[in-house]
Structures are given as structure tokens and as C-alpha cells.
Amino acid sequence: MALYCGDNFVYSQPAAAPGAPPTSRAPYGLSDYAAPPAAAANPYLWLNGPGVGGPASAASYLGAPPPPPGAAPGPFLQPPAAPGTFAGAQRGFAQPSASAPASPAGSAAPGELGWLSMASREDLMKMVRPPYSYSALIAMAIQSAPERKLTLSHIYQFVADNFPFYQRSKAGWQNSIRHNLSLNDCFKKVPRDEDDPGKGNYWTLDPNCEKMFDNGNFRRKRRRRAEASSNLTVPSGTSKSEGQSSRLRVSGKLEGDSPSSILRPSQSPEPPEGTKSTASSPGASTLTSTPCLNTFLSTFNTLNVNSSSSMGNQRTLPGSRRHLGGTQLPSSTFPNTSVPDSSPDSMQLSTVGGSNQLSSYYNPFSGGSSGDQSSPFSSPFYNFSMVNSLIYPRDGSDI
């Protein structure tokens, strides 16, 4: 007894009688392997079309294959089993049911696929949204015109005719078309000529933006980094005196050549004579535009006046060793030097009020030799943390 697979798992085939001779299976003829008709050679399953509509093609694609010539059945197409066995009858894959309506091709088409029926390719396109933005649709419509300009109504017509998806719910996408025409800089409005009948302005595409529409996709140009950084750089037409005045913003530069030059002020080049004679110099404009530097200089001027009134004309740095918090510093760090009244390092600065005033740009913080302990400048280590806070304020403002 042979077992075969069917719809209900397994069914049996009754064995032949022991004495009966084995039946020979008739070979298939060439007509059984003939090619399907031309109507059934369509590779695309556009249903209800000529490829599946005919009875022969329907039988070959959807029904059971033709039985072999002869009385003996094929190995996988067995007759229904006898009642009482554990198997049921084998059925075709796409046999029409009794309640199904008759197909338009007739009763000879047993395998009509009604669950996949679609009217045409246009119905499928109505369900799928085109992969283009509204700006790309407008650009395609304008580029398809002979004069490269269209009115708003003609743009609507182009989109609806070429893309069936937009034939429904026109109010939504037409509003988006109007917004893109108004907000996108690539679309320019061209007024209608006086002799041109009709109403409404024309819309055209900016020639500089034609390369932004690559294969229907709108690609906005990104702003280059060089263009963005050029807006933040200083113009190249600034004078040399302004560049020199910007260098005067930092004072008291430490020089590491020798230990004796730690507190030596930075020597800045003197401005030209033409700049001195003018009432408003680039340095004055720099001081006016930097309030932090003005506060720094005015504080030093006040300290200079107080120190000169309390100490007189004695501006000497002691050479003896000082102890500060248990730390001993060598005497070579602060050499015994004398600073004249008119120091060459002092420079002429104009104040915010516009009055020219000679003020010392640097204060050596010298202590009195008479040993006056009441003076706030009696020690050369005078509160350098306060000076640092003046030069580099803690509020985060830039000098």
C-alpha cells in the first residue's frame, strides 16, 4: 500500500491483487508538453486581462494539469479514496466554489482570482503617492512648458494629468502648491503682458536654481562654511594704526628672558605724530568701545595718584628679601632699581570724555623706604589677585 499526501495529510492507495500483472504507465505525448497559447504568455498578471481570461490558460495556470493519456492515473493525482478510509478527496488549488458567481469568461474558467481583481494600472497609481515633493512637481510643470512659464491653473492641470494620485482631494495639495510658490525663492512671479488675454501671473524658475532639481528631487544648496565664516572676519580694509591699537589692550606682559624682568611692562610702539595731533585717534575709539579696559585704566590712574601723594617722589623697589606665607623669594627677582618720574614706558591715552591727560600706564607698586606701615602700597606684593581680577574679570566678559 502506497501513501500519498493530500489536503487531509495522508491517504492510501489500495494495492493491486497479488496475482495480477503490473499495469504499465502510458508515456506522455508531445501534445501534453505543448507551449501555452500566445494569450497566456503575458508575464504580468494584470488580472481580467487576456493573459488569464481564456479557458485554456486558466486551466493550465489555475486548474489541475491534464491527466495523462491512458487508464492509469499519475502518482500524485489519485482518485478519491474509498469511503471508510482516513483520507478525504483531493481538491484543486483554485477550484471555484458553488456560491461564487460565474466568471465573465464562462464556466470553462475554473480558477478566477476574484480576491486580487483590480480594474487597471491607473487604479494602482491612484493608491500610490508619487515620490516627489511639491517643489519638484512645480519645477517639472514649469520645465515642461515651451516658454518655461505657467500660470497657477496650468500647474494644477499638469500635476493632476500626470499623477492620478492627485486627482482626488484637490483642496489639500493645491494649497501646498500655492505655499511652495510663495515661500520658495526658486520660483519667480512674472506679470502678464497687456496684450496677453486671461488672468493670473506667470510663474517661472530661477536660472540659478535649475541645477537644484536633480531627477525631479529638489536639493537645496547648503551654505558653505567659507561664506559663513567670512561674515565673522574683520574686513581687510582696516588701517595699520587700528591693528596697532588693538595690541595695546593687553599690558604688563611678562618677559621670561631674565628673572629681573618679570615685572617689566611691555614696551609698545609709539603712535605716529599724525595720530597724536588728531583729537580722536584709533586708540581712543578702542578705549571707548571697551568699558572693561576703561575701568581697568581708571582704577590704575586712581591708584597712581594715591601712591604719589602718600609716598612722594620715592619710587624705589627694595632689594631685601621678603617672606610671604613662609615662601622665600630671591632678591634678584625684584632688583634695586629706580623708576624716574617721566618713564619712557608711559604713554599718552585719551579718556572717554575726550580730554587729553598724561597718565602712567603701569604702576610699579613701590613701597615707601621710610617704613610707613599705614600706606596700602608698603609691600611690593600688593594684592596681585585684585589686579588679575581687573585684567581678567570673573563675569566672563571679553576684553
Curated annotation (Swiss-Prot):
InterPro entries (alphabetical): Fork_head_dom, FOX_domain-containing, TF_fork_head_CS_1, TF_fork_head_CS_2, WH-like_DNA-bd_sf, WH_DNA-bd_sf
Motif (Nuclear localization signal): 219-225
One term under GO cellular component: nucleus
UniProt note: phenotype after gene disruption: Embryonic lethality due to impaired pharyngeal arches segmentation. Embryos fail to form endodermal pouches and this results in failed pharyngeal arches segmentation leading to severe defects in the skull, jaw, and ears. Craniofacial neural crest cells undergo apoptosis in the mutant embryos at 10.0 day post coitum (dpc). Conditional deletion in epithelium leads to fusion of molars with abnormally patterned shallow cusps.
Residues modified to Phosphoserine: S99, S103, S258, S266, S268
GO annotation terms (biological process): epidermal cell fate specification; hair follicle development; odontogenesis of dentin-containing tooth; otic placode development; parathyroid gland development; pharyngeal system development; thymus development
DNA-binding region: 129-223
Gene Ontology MF, one: DNA-binding transcription factor activity, RNA polymerase II-specific
Keyword entries, A-Z: Developmental protein, DNA-binding, Nucleus, Phosphoprotein, Transcription, Transcription regulation
Protein known as: Forkhead box protein I3
Native source species: Mus musculus (Mouse)
Lineage of the species this protein comes from: Eukaryota, Metazoa, Chordata, Craniata, Vertebrata
Gene name, Swiss-Prot/TrEMBL: Foxi3
